[in-house]
Amino acid sequence: MKNNFTISQRNAIVESHLWCIKAVMKQNRALIRAAKLDTDDVYQELALRLIRAVMSYDPEKGDLEQHIFAQLRMELQKTAHSSVISLGAYRMRAAA
């Protein structure tokens, strides 16, 4: 069963968990730097993922914060991976 949060409840939960974004970014600052990601862009991507994480949260499957952190880490890894692939393709074109 999915959650039945109203939009105002969802927004309140998101606002109270914005600190999770900063925590994930701090834990992964080396990855963000290595992938040459803009921190403002990363924050925005993770904020969107936070909203989706709250909307997709199923209370029967575990703790909300664990779900949020897992979703944020997954999004950051996906973003970094995409950036590295794009950077590699750019370098290959530039070398040709």
Q: Where on the chain are the PLM-derived regions?
A:
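Alpha-helical promoter-recognition and RNA polymerase-docking modules of transcription initiation factors
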Residues: M1-L87
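Internal acidic/polar
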Residues: A89-A96
